[in-house]
């Protein structure tokens, strides 16, 4: 499996001289733009050169057996390419082409059955068909996804190329890298179970994020997730749990979906974190990849304004987290430091001073982080609307990071940067702030609801681990 993600040579079967045509040539262009340092072999019997590279009529004409073949020819011609791969000993194959089982036709079913037969005959490790294939920034295998993409602590397994690409690009926009990802499409040969095992054994991956439409062999998948989940968190976005989505799955990857009740039971019994949206998938993956295990479910909230304090408390308690009272010792220390006017000491903490006075923030976080009732901290980095003529909090981002980093290593600490409201300038400031926090190892979320849901998943996963030790 290593060479699948770290190929030193790639043959692109079906590369074209037409650069505006999606398929082999678009992959070739991306490899060149991303600075892939391995050897690239475009295969096209009608061309002498493609994008400055010598073209070859077929795989047998190559000067070496490449580590990976990317197959981009029309579906009826794919079996012949696989036959050649087997004959020359090329065992790692990514089939980009669609037109197989997902069509729901006898012809598509027959073609996919032939792909499976040839894989069994020659021992081919096939990703696909009908997929974008493997992605690995460390090796330059970035024909899709974020470019340039830096490696990071996350592995992604998905049956959708578009969804996988969206997640890699969103994570990269926050300065968070991906170690490896795979879009596996119909998963005819290599499936979720195979990639789960590979990523479980990769020491660079801390969290595995999955988008699934079908789990393949359910018993094997259940066993593997339950075993791996006690070592690494697995975040699953399951498509097609309701009727309309399930109908779409059949034409997308030719899979059959399971019911919502089945997946809820699966999550309870395996410790897998089941999420319901792209945003929740990304938010939870970020929290699990950056934060330590919380000791409990008690959350300290630092916010500004009495109404915000009330609403935020409700949001976190709705997610099953606690907003506990602080100890008498903590309360005494807070009262000595909280301004009398416009502030309320306690949990939540209502103090605008924390937005603009780094020393005040440092004192407060040190006090509450020492309180045994507090397992996690949430700091609101409100971007002040254009009122009150108060200094811009974005100027304090680096100082805030300096204060929160040592706290976050002891107790999970996140920030919320709510910059909506339709103001483009404030929106851009919010994006910039969230990126800097995430780059520094502190998850940052655009809403309190998203922060609460991510911390609820973090807490539930580590509670499961404590209850199910290795």
Give, region by region, the residue ranges found by the protein language model.
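Catalytic-core regions of core metabolic enzymes
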Residues: 1-470
């Amino acid at each position: 499996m290593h060479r699948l993600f770290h190929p030193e040579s790639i043959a692109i079967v079906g590369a074209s001289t037409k650069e505006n045509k999606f398929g082999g040539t678009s992959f070739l262009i991306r490899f060149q733009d991303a600075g892939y340092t391995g050897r690239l072999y475009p295969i096209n019997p009608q061309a002498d050169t493609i994008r400055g590279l010598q073209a070859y009529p077929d795989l047998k004409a190559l000067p070496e057996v490449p580590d990976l073949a990317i197959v981009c020819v029309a579906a009826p011609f794919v079996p012949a390419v696989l036959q050649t791969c087997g004959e020359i000993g090329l065992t790692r194959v990514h089939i980009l082409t669609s037109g197989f089982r997902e069509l729901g036709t006898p012809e598509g079913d027959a073609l996919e059955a032939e792909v499976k037969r040839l894989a069994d005959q020659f021992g081919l490790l096939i990703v696909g068909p009908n997929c974008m294939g493997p992605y690995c920034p460390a090796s330059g295998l970035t024909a899709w996804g974020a470019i340039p993409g830096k490696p990071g602590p996350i592995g992604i397994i998905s049956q959708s190329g578009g969804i996988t690409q969206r997640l890699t690009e969103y994570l990269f926009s926050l300065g968070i890298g991906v170690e490896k990802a795979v879009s596996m499409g119909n998963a005819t040969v290599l499936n979720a179970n195979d990639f789960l095992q590979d990523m479980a054994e990769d020491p660079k991956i801390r969290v595995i994020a999955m988008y699934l439409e079908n789990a393949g062999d359910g018993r094997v998948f259940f066993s593997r997730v339950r075993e791996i989940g006690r070592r690494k968190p697995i975040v699953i976005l399951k498509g097609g749990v309701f009727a309309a989505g399930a109908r779409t799955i059949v034409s997308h990857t030719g899979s059959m979906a399971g019911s919502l009740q089945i997946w809820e039971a699966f999550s309870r019994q395996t410790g897998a974190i089941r999420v319901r949206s792209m945003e929740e998938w990304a938010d939870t993956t970020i929290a699990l990849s950056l934060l330590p295990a919380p000791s409990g479910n008690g959350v300290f909230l630092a916010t500004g304004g009495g109404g915000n304090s009330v609403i935020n408390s409700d949001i976190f308690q709705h997610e099953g987290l606690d907003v506990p009272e602080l100890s008498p010792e903590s309360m005494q220390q807070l009262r000595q430091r909280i301004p009398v006017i416009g502030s309320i000491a306690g949990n939540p903490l209502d103090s605008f001073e924390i937005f603009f006075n780094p020393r005040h923030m440092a004192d407060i976080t040190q006090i509450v982080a020492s309180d045994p009732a507090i397992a996690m901290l949430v700091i609101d980095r409100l971007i002040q609307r254009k009122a009150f003529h108060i200094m811009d909090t974005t100027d304090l981002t680096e100082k805030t990071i300096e204060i929160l980093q040592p706290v976050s290593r002891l107790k999970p600490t996140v920030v919320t940067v709510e910059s909506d409201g339709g103001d483009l300038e404030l929106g851009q400031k919010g994006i910039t702030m969230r990126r800097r926090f995430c780059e520094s190892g502190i998850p940052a979320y655009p809403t309190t609801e998203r922060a609460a849901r991510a911390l609820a998943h973090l807490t539930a996963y580590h509670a499961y681990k404590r209850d199910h030790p290795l």
